[in-house]
């Protein structure tokens, strides 16, 4: 069955692309020919993240259906300034965004960017240009409270500290698709 429903994996790919765009837009990637490593983003389950010095990881937490009326953004017209009310239902997903940085004593200086700094930068991105970019793909973001950044010591030997903040997004799905799935899963039982 073909649907426009964004699966968790599809949403994750869009979030990874969005964060990569943040790194490019905010010039957090090293200049061409530089030996310095830039920030990278990948899914939480990838084992290769231990090889990176500066990394952002995405960890899916939960999803909730928040209602049959939501907002659909004008992605078809490439218009991200208006949202049209439609009878879609919204799935509200919560992702944890982890920022990690390998710290060596020789690295620390006045201009050293910590994992807390990167978490603050990404929150600003998701509350601004990043939200606009996600709207182009039909994903709405909820404002992030900056007080929700949690910083703790990482148990691994590679990273001494980790900053984590929750990212809540809303993903619409056509109600007709949802109703057909309900009837598939529960034959003979129909929603009122």
Regions found by a protein language model. Give the residues of each.
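Small/polar-rich, solvent-exposed N-terminal microdomains that initiate assembly or binding
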Residues: 1-81, 191-192
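Ordered, soluble secondary-structure elements with a strong preference for glycine-centered loop motifs
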Residues: 5, 9, 112, 116, ...
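Intrinsically disordered, low-complexity coil segments
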Residues: 25-39, 101-118
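Generic recognition of flexible, low-complexity loop/linker segments
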Residues: 44-45, 84, 153-154
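Short, charged, solvent-exposed linker or helix-capping segments at domain edges/interfaces
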Residues: 68-71, 176-184
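Short, cationic low-complexity segments
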Residues: 81-87, 181-192
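Oligomerization/assembly interface segments of phage tail-like spikes and tubes
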Residues: 86-112, 120-122, 160-172
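Acidic-leaning, charged glycine-interspersed low-complexity segments
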Residues: 117, 124-177
